[in-house]
Amino acid sequence: MVVRQETPTLPIERSRKVAQVLQRRVEIAQDRFNKRVAKVGQSWPLATTAGVPSLTSWTEWSQYLVDTAQRSVLFLDTLRQRGNNYHEHQAAGTPPLLHFEWEMVLDARGFAQPVNYALVRIVPPEGVKVDATRRPYVIIDPRAGHGPGIGGFKDDSQVGVALAAGHPVYFVIFFPEPQPGQTLSDVCTAEQAFVRKVRELHPKSPKPAIVGNCQGGWAAMMLAASDPEITGPIVINGAPMSYWGGAWSEGEGDNPMRYSGGLLGGSWLASLSADMGHGVFDGAHLVSNFATLNPANALWEKYYNLYSKIDTEPPRFLEFERWWGGFYLMNREEIEWIVQNLFVGDKVWSGATGANGKLFDLREIRMPIVLFASMGDNITPPQQAFNWVADVYGSTDEIKARGQVIVGLLHEDVGHLGIFVSGKVAKKEHAQIVEVLQSIELLPPGLYGMKIDEVKTAGGKVEYRVSFVERQLEEIAAQLNRFERKDEEPFEAVAAMSEFNQKAYEMLAQPTVQALSNESSAEIGRQLHPMRLEQSVMSDRNPWLAWLGPMAAAVRAARQPAAESSQFKQAERAASECISASLDYYRDLRDAASEAQFFQTFGVMFPALHPAQPKRAETRAKAQPSDASQHPTVREALDAIEQGGYAEALARTACLLARKGEPLPLARFELKGQLAREYADLLPPLAAQEWRAIRGRQEAICRHEPDRAIETLPKLLASAEDRARCLTLLERLLADPRVSAARATPTQRATLQRIREVLAAGSTAPARKRGKAKVRTRAQATPRRAAAAH
């Protein structure tokens, strides 16, 4: 992808831009706060009326006093139950909080290089039947402070929808404490062993689909890139892949976590925390960072929601809090690798680092990749989920020439956690991904947007219809990145500063910190972490709360809730809304100030001090030729325009006759499958992966040399038998009423006529032999003629 070169922006202009954005952010925050407070005044009758209190109001007041006193006791008792659950969960070893029963398959703690990971098989619930020959699903949850289980938190979850569709489901879990010396490279190796085991258990099934949630997403991509032959399609949900990306504009401040690495001085704080933990990093730090993103929810809303719905809300609250309070640990080597290579350095996918001596090259992945992100996600904004595609492939042509299929699905407003735990998202987006994954494998190489439309049937039932729209990488990258990614330049300064600070810490402070730290001090520090104290203090272990349980039982026996229409409950809700609005106002101002400080420091001051620092965007621009046809991968395909055989000829013909710019409804793939089965005798026996590779090269040829692509078709069909076979297939397809129902465009008719004329004329020139044996004759190829129906 070509990055437009511009003259460097003067520091004063950058400062002016920072000031403009800050001013706009503050105005938006103020306006949002004013509207919320004004809405409270309009919705509360007592705010607009006044009068002498009546007997009715005094009655309501007494009822409200009884109700609020009872709710207070029940609220405190729920927090006590949360504390008891926390201690029970800790005593049980903090097991995974999967809603489903599971069986251990492989425990990596017993591997030659042990890690605290394991593979479990999800036991289908009663009434759910699973077909062992269907594609298995392997779900990887994020190891980001919490324990595993978010992908299978309830029936309406990723696990639930895959089981409901009849697929075997496996889950990658992990244990609270890491094995001594384990690294992320070791974890990647263990996950490879897990996938091989799944394939061994399902020899008649397609390769397993790998589903990665959040940080489990980049783990899934590392797994697939390090051993591309063992995995099926990859689905990554809310997964940060391009860590410098974000939405910097004059609108709302959506991505505050994007700037925290720079404002905290880089990676050295993670090393310090791990050293204070005696070589172990406490995941509670990560959870705390997550909580501070939304102080209104962390400090008030979730507790008021419990208090206001105390008769119905406790079970849901306690279920979520059991997972929220299950904190897991990492080795220092693991957290340092993550922070230095991913969050701050953003250099894993550039080929600067890898595992077991092998660099991670995402272009090695040959199976389709599905990216699911949300505009409402302020932890993994769409830019972070998508920009890696532009960095790794550079252009639409390279995606096609490499035979890759990438599908993007974008939700409008669900938050980060909602991507994984929302029942609505599970029943719609996740369920449809499972349903159409086989069809995604049949897509021609390219970049696609997945669209899910809701349609109501005559009976009022909601059904989902899926279609795919081919997109251009260059257009999508421009839409998501409003400043052509120039706002990522300050992160290069952050990376340089982080390296300096890390070395300074390792030289000047680390030896002392490590000498003063021991297992006892580390454990005391963990137990006194505010996130743990929040969970543990309110429990039966606290002797000052001995009265709470019996009193709560008495309150439940004599519960007298006040009416929801009570003016005092309305006043309570109004006060709560004002408190929430104030905390949101504080958050917006805090985030705006942090953003301004970040860009002023690393976008203005650092470039002035280090003007010769190389720019990643300039490096990318130099690496990508201005003419897409000159890209090495595309050039290789064009140079082989006269090379190939029957499979290449069919793929080229399909490319030449394909409809351009139209959505691809799911029904079209179902028809392709039917046609492929019926005309199997005229199709080459190719696996879908092999067909995509061939189709991708032919796409590049047809895109850049359409006339030569037609003229050289006879060279791919050197024998009269192959030419006759190809023409027979074309004529039979055109005569099929299911195909002719879709009227050909004038361009298609003209192209078809040229193909007929060229093939009818024939050619005595033999096809040039490729360097390797034709892919259709390889013994290891898995016949899948349906794929040839592209």
Report residues per predicted region.
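Short beta-strand/loop motif that positions the catalytic acidic residue
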Residues: I365, L371-A373, D377
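Short, surface-exposed "cap/lid" segments of acyl-processing enzymes
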Residues: A91-P178
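Conserved acidic catalytic loop of the alpha/beta-hydrolase fold
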Residues: E177-Q182, T189-P208
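Alpha/beta-hydrolase-fold enzymes
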Residues: V2-D77, E200, K204, M221-E333, ...
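Conserved alpha/beta-hydrolase "acid-adjacent" motif
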Residues: I379-Q384
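Small-residue-enriched hydrophobic alpha-helices in membranes
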Residues: R616-H790
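Gly/Ala-rich beta-loop-alpha elbow adjacent to hydrolase catalytic centers
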Residues: V211-A220
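C-terminal catalytic histidine-bearing segment of alpha/beta-hydrolase fold enzymes
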Residues: A401-A477
